[in-house]
Amino acid sequence: MRIDLVVPCFNEEDNVDEFVKVCSSVFDESEFSYRLIMVDDGSNDATFSHLTDLAHKNPCVEVIQFSRNFGKEAAMIAGLEASSGEYSAIIDADLQQRPEDALAMLRILVQSEGEYDCVAAYQEKRKESWLITKMKGMFYSIFAKAARSQAIPHASDFRVFTATVRDAIISLPESYRFSKGIFAWVGFRVKPYAYVPSDRLQGESKWSLSSLIRYAFEGILSFTTLPLRFVTYLGAVTSIGALLYAFITVLQILVFGKDVPGYASTLVVVLLLGGAQLLSIGILGEYLARVYMEGKQRPLYIVRSRVCSEVSDE
């Protein structure tokens, strides 16, 4: 049996050599054959040069180079489309996700004898700040309710799965891909696997707080119509509030004979309605933009080159 490990790489020149070394030492001693599908996501450092040298020396390494940076989601799908083993895995190149855990997850999947289709890793102890941890927890809770999908809380893209799951993931044609939502949407039987991430070998994480927030919004917009329902609810609440205010105003004038000053209240109402309208238009625009981009049917990525070993692995 063979497992194909898909490894997205972006500016990982300081990590890829050690990653391949560790991964090879782990799987060379295992009962499985393996292949490392290293996807260079338009790196602007020497990542591709390092990967090319590794591919020429190691028959288990295959390299896919993008024409530019298309993002991790595109890198993952490119690697999965190149995968043909009985099992596939997604793992980062910075060794925070250990190859030893990938092997343990594979063994759990194989030994389940069909009981599970996927083993998904989640962080048992998080090393992030309290704020980011809480924000991620809130996101998973909102996403699970809004998208009606059972996403494993704090699960990463680090997982091992069968060819059937891989084919199901590849079959989804959308351009705006949100892997955590896709993994949850395709379903199958998933076994959670707790792990503690190691310290990053070299460099810094590519994820900032702003990029995490943007990624969360992408997930919500890609997998649920909750924001559109929010617009509907906002319109209903605003209409009810306006009717109540009109009723109270008429009551004060006709019954109590009060002179209701209108300038300040009118200004507040106009600003409130204007803000609600702009918010609604913005949400509708986000969905319309996605329809527009999906209609273009552009490829998720463009491959500049592929590199395989000149040495046979037979």
List each model region and its residues.
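Hydrophobic helical membrane-anchoring modules
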Residues: 178-314
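Alpha-helical hydrophobic/aromatic positions enriched in membrane-embedded helices and signal peptides
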Residues: 32-33, 37, 86, 154, ...
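Residue-level signature of catalytic and energy-coupling elements of molecular machines
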Residues: 5, 23, 79, 94, ...
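Structured catalytic core of nucleotide-sugar glycosyltransferases
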Residues: 1-130
